[in-house]
Amino acid sequence: MKIIDQMKDEKLGSAILYNFTLGYGKPVPMELYNYVLPFIFHEAFRANVLQATSFRNCIELCYKEDYRCLDAFKAAIIQDEMVTSKSLGLALVNRWLSFSVTDEKMSGTAHESTVMMLNEPYRLGEWFKEMSIEEIEECLVIERERIIILETNSIGQDMDLSKYDRLGDVTVYPEVEEEEIPILIQDATIVVVNKTVLNEDNLKNARKLKLICLFATGYNNIDLNYCRRHGIMVANVKGYSTPSVAQHTFSLLFYLYEKLPFYDHYVKSGRYSRDTSFTHFEKYFNEIEGKTWGIVGLGDIGQRVATIATAFGANVIYYSTSGRHDDARYERVDFDTLLERSDVISIHAPLNKATYHLFDQTAFAKMKETAYLINVARGAIIVEEDLAKALVDGKIAGAGLDVLEQEPMAKNNPLLAIRNSMRLVITPHIAWASVESRTRCVEEVYLNIESFIEGKGRNIIGHDLQ
């Protein structure tokens, strides 16, 4: 059928209509011929027709590749009428087809000929034999999902979301105010958010809503109880940020551990240019090799950090906040033991009742004064006032934070009083946000929506899609 890509005329059309008539297996109503060439001339339809299980399934496959195909089919049914008419005339002249009138209705019948066998129109004939024109046209009507994507600035302006247009009618809002949410989502069937809070107050008028997708793993901003009561599915994304968060864990540590703020300032202030020695190590630093690295939460990210820390020669121990993780490669200890033995502690646990304010003044008092604390998990795992005091009092050597209990950071956060960047470094929740990580996140959400539309369900939280 590659010849169709170069030709769209009555000679080829007559061969297509002849094969269609053979597949139909009985006299073809004349008006039905107008529905043949528009589909066979369509590249995606031809590519799918032999593998599809039905005409509707073939349309769905085409729609999945390009939702605009429905409009293309409808337009072609009108535009190709002349080609169809000429093709039928040529088939009549060549005696491939003949036409007769029965009960005041004209129909076409195929005769023996040397016309090349074309499988695609033959299959279409087999399908149409069991369908009325009304049923054919019904297959060309697919109700599109109404997809609302909120706070797209949180995923990055460099991310291309145009692919989502394949899934439905998409409206994007870079930023939203809380009071706007009920109006923006009231007609949505699918809503995508990152950190926007969705609860009964702003969901109660979204009566068409079927799915909430998160550009995130955590879902504590979604009222799951309300969603369950109203049949709204919630889907998150998992594992997309593991490489990025693990990388940022070490970025925060190295910044502190090797006293990089001091040495960068030393050079740029001109002191190095005035020095008489080729080296200057006024602020002493150590190697990771041989040190004990304590991990709180040995999930995917915790395991990735453990692997890298081991490669640096560290001795890894871990505390499982859930009690579910048991990894024979590393020593499992209780929380107090981890605090007492660790030279570096990195937090990779979820926020829950067991981890809320886990690191308080009691915990800091048990840590080594030379220890560093890294938190790339959830801000509320640390009591920030207690951490600030521990840093000021020298209870620990330093802390690297990518998360805070309140985000954006509160203006009166006690950590802002610590100006020494060798003791404390804070980044604005960016550990997850490498270009590659955000690209994976966007793709994962796309797959979650696609799977839901297909009735399969993917990454559904709390209950399965039946």
Per-range role (PLM):
Residues 301:
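Hydrophobic/small residue at the entry helix of a nucleotide-binding pocket
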Residues 234, 370, 376-466:
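Rossmann-like dinucleotide-binding domain for NAD(H)/NADP(H)
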Residues 238-292:
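Phosphate-binding beta-alpha-beta segment of Rossmann-like dinucleotide-binding domains, i.e.
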Residues 143-188:
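N-terminal glycine-/charge-rich "phosphate-binding" loop or analogous flexible N-terminal tail
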Residues 113-142:
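Glycine-rich, aromatic-bearing surface loops/beta-hairpins
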Residues 89-103:
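A short, conserved structural fragment
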Residues 199-202, 321-414:
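Rossmann-like adenosine-cofactor binding region
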Residues 78-93:
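Short amphipathic alpha-helical interaction segments
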